[in-house]
Amino acid sequence: MKLNTIKPGIGSAKPKRRVGRGIGSGLGKTCGRGHKGQKSRAGGFHKVGFEGGQMPLQRRLPKRGFTVYGKKQVREIKLSTLQLIDLSEFNPSVLYDHGLIKNINDPVKIILGNQLIKRAIKIKDLIISRGAKEAVEQMGGLVELTVKDVNGV
């Protein structure tokens, strides 16, 4: 087999449209564009959303809502993920060192997930869900919070 002998599979590629090659081809004379009108001309077509002078839909509908530019995305980490790291104390710098977060200043929330933890751990300076906090304390772990919510208040 050589590169110049490779052909696409049967039915996988449509044949090229040869227009303007006689009426017997089915695409002669007007080349499948019909007679006259804007769409038959070269370069003649309307822009997307144009409705022939009628007020377009995107302008008929009212504006709604706004974009919050200062919103911070919270990175959620499951307790079962922390179980995979052989440490007993977790804080933002530990999560950063192990590659669980990309920026040490990004807000992180520890969530329960679907698996329970098997050992006592200490969580410091991280946002934690109620279920995760109960699971940590049930195993004899400790949760020290200095961060109350996403904005650090």
Curated annotation (Swiss-Prot):
Ranges of compositional bias, category Gly residues: 21-31
Pfam families in alphabetical order: Ribosomal_L27A
Signal peptide from the UniProt entry: none
Annotated GO biological process: translation
Keywords: Ribonucleoprotein, Ribosomal protein, RNA-binding, rRNA-binding
Gene Ontology CC: cytosolic large ribosomal subunit
Family: Belongs to the universal ribosomal protein uL15 family.
Function recorded in the entry: Binds to the 23S rRNA.
Subunit structure: Part of the 50S ribosomal subunit.
Descriptive protein name: Large ribosomal subunit protein uL15
Native species: Nitrosomonas europaea (strain ATCC 19718 / CIP 103999 / KCTC 2705 / NBRC 14298)
